[in-house]
Amino acid sequence: MSKHLTHLKQLEAESIQIMREVAAEFDNPVMLYSVGKDSSVLLHLARKAFYPGKIPFPLMHVDTNWKFKEMIEFRDQMAEKHGFDLIVHKNPRGIEMGISPFTHGSAKHTDIMKTEGLKQALDMHGFDAAFGGARRDEEKSRAKERVYSFRDSKHRWDPKNQRPELWNIYNGKVDKGESIRVFPLSNWTELDIWQYIYLEGIEIPSLYLAAERPVVERDGTLIMVDDERMPIESGEDVQTKMVRFRTLGCYPLTGAVESEAQTLPEIIQEMLLCTTSERQGRVIDNDSAGSMEKKKMEGYF
């Protein structure tokens, strides 16, 4: 790769090359679109990779029924604006059971509405490759995951049964029923993502920017009161605080951080001084009985 490219242009070129290779190599790929900052970068890269043509695979959102309202609105706006094929899947069994992170807990909610829902959708549509926005700097189990992450016929990830990746050579051979999770952003950092969003003018949900929002402090985490379904427990007060989100997911399981960063340059400045992981606000990551590695072995993203 040219030494004259900036590090962001090198990362961009690497990601685009991975996307083009998957589109050429697999029969039925899909991009998992979770509506966050990494998904927004993936969408931007996919549009660049196949411009001026249409993105040659659909985008799929596994909707848990508990996403921030703004995320759903943003998702639909992006689909209408850019004209990509959007698949939205909700686990019908979970909906029928009335699964809620408040009444059933974070582990059961994640297992049924996210993991089981994702596996249902992949099987239903017969996808043999699925793009995801995970990065190696996010979390320790993701740090050892390959760009082409092999999954067996049950969508399980076995960290001891992965393929060597030499330079930019990837092995995409799968038998019927098996699949590959593909992570084009593996070598990006959170700071890279924000700098790229700023330089490329990529649209993101405004939840990433600091604003006054209604929150409740629960177990040391600031949870935003996004709708009327959130129960306020005895002794809790809804407070209006200047907060933003470093990561987005189900609103009852995603903690806000107090911040004054209302613009992208201010977020980047904040990232340069930050010493904590962006996933510190994810309640599911604090559930020792359901670690990320265990979830991935069961078929999680």
Swiss-Prot record:
It is an enzyme of class 2 (transferase). It catalyses: sulfate + ATP + H(+) = adenosine 5'-phosphosulfate + diphosphate. CDD domains: Sulfate_adenylyltransferase_2 (cd23946). One of its GO terms (biological process) is hydrogen sulfide biosynthetic process. One of its GO terms (molecular function) is ATP binding. The keyword NADP does not apply. Keywords: ATP-binding, Nucleotide-binding, Nucleotidyltransferase, Transferase. Pathway: Sulfur metabolism; hydrogen sulfide biosynthesis; sulfite from sulfate: step 1/3. InterPro entries: PAPS_reduct_dom, Rossmann-like_a/b/a_fold, SO4_adenylTrfase_ssu, Sulfate_adenylyltrnsfr_sub2. Its EC number is 2.7.7.4. Belongs to the PAPS reductase family. CysD subfamily. PANTHER family: SULFATE ADENYLYLTRANSFERASE SUBUNIT 2. With CysN forms the ATP sulfurylase (ATPS) that catalyzes the adenylation of sulfate producing adenosine 5'-phosphosulfate (APS) and diphosphate, the first enzymatic step in sulfur assimilation pathway. APS synthesis involves the formation of a high-energy phosphoric-sulfuric acid anhydride bond driven by GTP hydrolysis by CysN coupled to ATP hydrolysis by CysD. Heterodimer composed of CysD, the smaller subunit, and CysN. This is Sulfate adenylyltransferase subunit 2 1. It comes from Shewanella sediminis (strain HAW-EB3). The gene is cysD1.
